[in-house]
Amino acid sequence: MNNSIRQLRAELGWSQAHLADLLNVSRQTVNAIETGRYDPSLPLAFAIATLFARPIEAIFNPDQEPA
């Protein structure tokens, strides 16, 4: 799933480690989400959206439309 986490994180000057601490996940998890290798759970996606004060759909974009 495409997302804008890396860009949003950079705008705030946050490292992957800092974001990981705020979300209570590993830095590797943040990296995997940013690079699209891992899709976050719904609760984690909501936590990310809350931290960045944006709706989920403004951060996450599915690779393809559902059928």
Predicted segment positions?
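Key DNA-contact positions within bacterial/archaeal DNA-binding proteins
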Residues: 17, 28, 57
